[in-house]
Amino acid sequence: ITDYDVSYLENSGYESDLGLSNIFAYEEYVNAFYSQYGKKVDKLSFLLGLRYEDSKQEIDQRTTNQFEIKRYSDWFPTLNLSYEFSKMESITFGYSKRIQRPRGWNINPFPRRNSVTSLWRGNPFLDPTFTNSLEIGYLKRYKKFTINSEIFYSNSKDNNVRVTEDTGELITVTGGDDDELNPTLLVPVLETYPINLSENTRFGGVLNLTYTPSRSVRLNGSFTLNNTKIRGEFKNQNFDSDNTSWNARFSSFIKLPFDISWQLFGFFRGPSETAQSRNKAFGTVTSAFQKNILDRKGTISFKISDVFNTGKWRYETFTNTFFREGEGQWREPSYVLTFSYRFNDKNNKRTRRQKSNDLNFGGGDDERIFND
């Protein structure tokens, strides 16, 4: 529920400003049941699953008097196969059907102004996205080295994408009377909102390598390459696009002298492009140190997030009538020093796990800094 009301006192009482107030109620009901059956025969194992879901959404935007009820139901099968050539080598196959429901901010139709020239609004008529996925994986373990690879294919219907349009409104933007490099301009106001396009197909592979030369050193790296094809049309505009993108991760855990643990984590994402937007490449590196003190009852941790201040994403949005550049950053580089003390020795290990959860790298899938 969003309950944000801006009212002004008039002669007859308080009157809401419909341009600023946002009173939005959203309820979602999901009823489901599922069953599973698995078995292992010699080196072959399988797991079959079937889930049924019935969903209901109630969307009530009271400021703009928009009310919508949506219901949908479907079956979601799952199949997982695994064959072990040996304890050190195996191959897997998986099929699944999944549903991705739109989040509340994607369906709230009340406009939100990100800047004087940029608006965002949700789409109350947004449907969920249904995805069928196939995956084939191969795992090979050596004494100090592990290779984990995967090839994947997915096809999504009613894919959720964002579109940007010119509202026709113009805003005067000026750099000041003495700023000759930034003269006064009339800038169009752009509005972005999500829609369902017909189809999204992804095909690619993942390679994950782990190297553990000793108990004091553990190195891990992964690389993902995928090709995405989007097919769809909206308001007589073709949104077809073909794009190949990549991302990479690495992490390391090293035991240093004086009982100091050091962990390093990095994430890099290559450029990507759709019919209306272009995202530039970016990457970020985070580092942390930890030392146990006071007979291992106390722990000092020091974490540096985004060491090189490179965790900024830059993007471009374009059509035949406008071109926009933007830049964003979750947060600037930060430095966190933490001290913890464990009073109960019997629960030391459990406490260390809880504290390490507080020190994560943040953003997307959280990465734990230290493992017990």
Feature-to-residue mapping (PLM):
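Outer membrane beta-barrel strand-and-loop segments of large Gram-negative receptors
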Residues: E15-Y34, D127, Y142, T146-R218, ...
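Conserved C-terminal beta-signal and adjacent last beta-strands/turns
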Residues: T224, S241-D372
